[in-house]
From Swiss-Prot:
Post-translational modification note: Ubiquitinated by CUL3-KLHL15 complex; this modification leads to proteasomal degradation.
Subunit structure: Component of the serine/threonine-protein phosphatase 2A complex (PP2A). This complex consists of a common heterodimeric core enzyme, composed of a 36 kDa catalytic subunit (subunit C) and a 65 kDa constant scaffold subunit (PR65 or subunit A), that associates with a variety of regulatory subunits. Proteins that associate with the core dimer include three families of regulatory subunits B (the R2/B/PR55/B55, R3/B''/PR72/PR130/PR59 and R5/B'/B56 families), the 48 kDa variable regulatory subunit, viral proteins, and cell signaling molecules. Interacts with SGO1. Interacts with AKT1.
Protein name per the record: Serine/threonine-protein phosphatase 2A 56 kDa regulatory subunit beta isoform
Role this protein plays: As the regulatory component of the serine/threonine-protein phosphatase 2A (PP2A) holoenzyme, modulates substrate specificity, subcellular localization, and responsiveness to phosphorylation. The phosphorylated form mediates the interaction between PP2A and AKT1, leading to AKT1 dephosphorylation.
Family label: Belongs to the phosphatase 2A regulatory subunit B56 family.
Keyword line: Cytoplasm, Phosphoprotein, Ubl conjugation
Organism of provenance: Rattus norvegicus
Location of Phosphoserine modifications: S32, S35, S44, S46, S47, S48
Region described as Disordered: spans on this chain: 1-55, 473-497
Compositional bias ranges of the Low complexity kind: 1-19
Amino acid sequence: METKLPPASTPTSPSSPGLSPVPPPDKVDGFSRRSLRRARPRRSHSSSQFRYQSNQQELTPLPLLKDVPASELHELLSRKLAQCGVMFDFLDCVADLKGKEVKRAALNELVECVGSTRGVLIEPVYPDIIRMISVNIFRTLPPSENPEFDPEEDEPNLEPSWPHLQLVYEFFLRFLESPDFQPSVAKRYVDQKFVLMLLELFDSEDPREREYLKTILHRVYGKFLGLRAYIRKQCNHIFLRFIYELEHFNGVAELLEILGSIINGFALPLKTEHKQFLVRVLIPLHSVKSLSVFHAQLAYCVVQFLEKDATLTEHVIRGLLKYWPKTCTQKEVMFLGEMEEILDVIEPSQFVKIQEPLFKQVARCVSSPHFQVAERALYFWNNEYILSLIEDNCHTVLPAVFGTLYQVSKEHWNQTIVSLIYNVLKTFMEMNGKLFDELTASYKLEKQQEQQKAQERQELWRGLEELRLRRLQGTQGAKEAPVPRPTPQVAASGGQS
């Protein structure tokens, strides 16, 4: 089903009379680039146009599969598969309308046949089926027309040949799901090269195509045991190139969704290969700029790993703290949400190992001037399981956050945040009143000492300033005083000859 997207406004050229005047450089806000950008309109940019055969023969309708005797069924099926391998130019809406309709009808019939007719998938038709699928779906994807393409703001380029391409994908899916499907026969044609080309298609901008590819690759992973390790390896390569080289790949969310299902089926104990995938691929994926596009799927994969092996918790949390965003509040809120999901499944023995660095980071988030970050961090205390972990380790957690909570409660500009902090402090006081009183007294004493030191510094600087002024006045006075002229010495004369 096509995703409904809001209509985009057409960009105005610099010479257009309706263009707003450009503000002077000193008035431009460098932080509002995203808000000033206009979403590019949806355009059809097909790669299938380069595969169009201009001198092809005109297609003619063939008899229906249900109307021929069983002895002629497979021969007619092969002819229809060959007919569906003919490509058309969909950028020209009025070209070859009859041929396009003949192919569409044939594809519809193939979809219905393979999904409902038993005994049609015999060994001789496998190469014809894979050939027809390959001709239609495998192509060089066009480069993105917008180098700054933002999936959240810009319209994707949709595939113009989708009326045919969708039916090919549907046929492929039903072919894989058919009760008559034989992986032992299909593995001669669905090999590593085929899978590699299938993975490359995940970079398509068309979300409808990526949705089909996600389901198909999952079926391939389940049917072909010999290809599983290869599929995981190639997914690793795609992610690593995305992190360290390209920083752009449209199908990351779909691939992570497949991997989430795969991780859920991993046998225990986990292999070293799987643990390395978590540490070297999934954790560094948190560092990319477009994290918001696939963060939900990524967080699911991480949590699945921790549910499989609790000993990985420390590696994961320290990795997230390493990549914690410093300037992007949107990503910071996502990190806090993922951290709460991790704490929901953490073992108490693992919590002890990471509680201090974790809650120091939570305290920094509470002190953030961005109220959404502070609010999301304070919501940790609304989680009953996290609250029980904090209560069991109150002597470590409370000293790590108390100073920040107390200070922010006096200084934060947002009254909602102040109210939430008061609730957290009240919870701590009920948990361990004695420790709370000790920390309160210690905090106040520390503040008094800081004020005393600040006052001593001010007095020291004031004394130094007075000393400088006295020396300056002394130097100026010495310069203004008259300099005595030297008296010439008279030669002694006593009448001596």
